[in-house]
Amino acid sequence: QVDSSVGGKVAINHELGKNLIGSFYQPKKVLIDLKCLETLPKREIISGMAEIIKYGFIYDQDLFSYLSANSQQLMALNFECLAKVVSRSCEIKADVVRQDEKEANLRAILNFGHTIAHAIESNTKYKLYTHGEAVGIGLYGAVLLSHYHEMVDVNTVRVTKELLEKFELPLQAKQCNVDTLFEIVGRDKKAVNGKVKWILLAEIGKVIISDQVSTEQIKKVLHEIVV
């Protein structure tokens, strides 16, 4: 409801990576019914929350704070709270896509946490983790990487960990190999001239795009998120 429903990206996975084959096709209308969420198992609700948390990181500190303050109500499917975060997430996604439909630059920020997440999904053959669970680990990894890149302090890492734990999202990946993850990351669809463009956190609510992340920093993060 809050992510792929808006934006027009249509893609399929390949054995070499996630969403590597695709196109753009804008729908005429997107219908969202919060009542549908009542039909989902808890694991899927948790997975969807990962994408909402992402929007707080990349675009809206107030959304991030609201999620932290209302985690219990959201997990209990309080419709008033859900309506706020779902609508705000869609507004953010639409605003970004409106400015950069084909991902020439700005739209890449929507991939915050997804470089690592896609690698985890690929390494585990898309069977061990839901997309949202992998994104949860990826968000934590992206904030760690931002910290090691000296962009955010250790308190931001702590706040990130606490929020992800409130929504019962995993912070570490099982059945993954660091070297394999590093290889998959290098094939990321955002890579240009062999350099991966990382989405890094400048502060909660603001991110930057950088290809100046060192191999040592990446491997340090991967070692920290793999168990």
Segments and roles (model prediction):
Residues 65-66, 70-179:
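Active-site segments that bind and position negatively charged phosphate/pyrophosphate groups
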Residues 42, 46, 60-64, 79, ...:
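Alpha-helix initiation and N-capping motif
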Residues 24-25, 31-32, 111, 199-202:
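Short beta-strand segments
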Residues 50, 151-227:
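C-terminal charged capping/lid subdomain of soluble metabolic enzymes
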Residues 19, 26, 106-107, 196:
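A generic hydrophobic-helix recognition signal that picks specific residues
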Residues 1-70:
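A glycine/threonine-rich phosphate-anchoring loop and its flanking beta-alpha core
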Residues 3-4, 13, 18, 44, ...:
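Short glycine- and Lys/Arg-enriched binding-loop motifs that mark or flank ligand-binding interfaces
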